[in-house]
């Protein structure tokens, strides 16, 4: 850790020193990091730490975008940079009851750097489950070329003057979020759907057109952490109160079809976006392919609309352990003895 700090922190500071020697501070900083890059090679991950470092664009793979401590705010203040300029690092995730669900969720939905730094014994407890469901992080890119909260990036012109070595600086990501919704579109060959993460804010209705969805269509809304199908809605839906057990909400929103369909799965917060390889409806049979994990119960949540009656569930490579109807969906639990 000390070696990392020696290499990547502080060398962009003290402009008076470089001015007295009539040296270009940015050039000196880049030359130093270039030497490190040449030594470790392109295959090694290099992160700038901490604070926004536009001087190192093209050299570093990731950047801690703010000060010490996980920053929800930074994910919206520099969303346009993520996986375009570099990989955003909101800082390490703490698997505490207060932060485990919402921090892992926000990091994964935004496609940011996912770093756990808890004591090993924590990973033997149930609090590790949200991290398991949020990993791996899918590669995502921002859907817009602007920052949702531009309050910090609008100060990037100060980068040449705010280099004292202390911080946070006016352009570094802050710790105070102004937005609480994170939207991720999942586009697969067999289906498209959206995920909406909520970390706080007001409990008010969310219009579908503000999520880029057709307000004239009907959508199933499934809350991932509680595994509750909230219902089928047109125009908008009410998210309800955040459960203090999770401190966040994650909604999977799928267009309602006129036949049984996958509502969600439990393996990953994308509700099938990671492990589902194919889903189809033919001859009144819902079929598909999925990659499962050994000894980890895999749950399919399938709609059962009016006019249809569930008959049976069969699969190869896993055993059907339980089938249970809950409201207007079937919960199918599978168990696999091997990965695949």
Where do the protein language model's features map onto the residues?
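A structural micro-motif
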Residues: 43-44, 219, 308, 318
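Catalytic cores of secreted or luminal carbohydrate-active enzymes
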Residues: 108-173, 218-275
């Amino acid at each position: 850790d000390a070696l990392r700090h020696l290499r990547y922190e502080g060398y962009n500071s003290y402009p008076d020193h470089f001015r007295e020697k009539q040296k270009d501070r940015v050039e000196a900083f880049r030359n130093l990091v270039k030497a490190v890059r040449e030594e470790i090679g392109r295959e090694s991950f290099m992160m700038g730490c901490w604070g926004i470092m536009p001087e190192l664009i093209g050299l570093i793979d990731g950047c801690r975008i703010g000060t010490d401590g996980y920053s929800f705010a930074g994910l919206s203040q520099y969303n346009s940079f993520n996986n375009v300029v570099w990989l955003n690092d909101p800082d390490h995730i703490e698997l505490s009851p207060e932060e485990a669900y919402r921090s892992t969720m926000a990091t994964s939905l935004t496609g940011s750097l996912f770093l756990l730094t808890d004591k090993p014994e924590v990973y033997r407890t149930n609090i590790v489950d949200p991290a398991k469901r949020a990993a791996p992080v899918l590669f995502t890119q921002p859907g817009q070329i602007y920052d949702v909260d531009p309050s910090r990036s609008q100060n990037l012109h100060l980068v040449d003057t705010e280099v004292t070595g202390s911080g946070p600086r006016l352009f570094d990501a802050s710790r105070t979020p102004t937005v609480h919704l994170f939207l991720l579109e999942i586009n697969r060959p067999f289906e498209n759907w959206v995920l909406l993460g909520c970390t706080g804010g007001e409990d008010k209705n969310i219009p579908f057109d503000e999520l880029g969805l057709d307000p004239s269509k009907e959508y199933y809304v499934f809350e991932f952490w509680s595994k509750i199908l909230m219902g089928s809605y047109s125009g908008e839906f009410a998210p309800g109160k955040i459960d203090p057990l999770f401190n966040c909400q994650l909604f999977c929103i799928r267009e309602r079809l006129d036949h049984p369909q996958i509502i969600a799965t439990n393996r990953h917060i994308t509700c099938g976006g990671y492990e589902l390889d194919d889903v189809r409806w033919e001859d009144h049979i819902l079929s598909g392919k999925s990659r499962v994990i050994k000894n980890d119960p895999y749950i399919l949540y399938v709609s059962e609309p009016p006019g249809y009656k569930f008959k049976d569930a069969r699969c190869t490579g896993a055993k059907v352990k339980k089938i249970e109807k809950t409201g207007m969906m079937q919960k199918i639990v599978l168990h696999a003895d091997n990965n695949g």
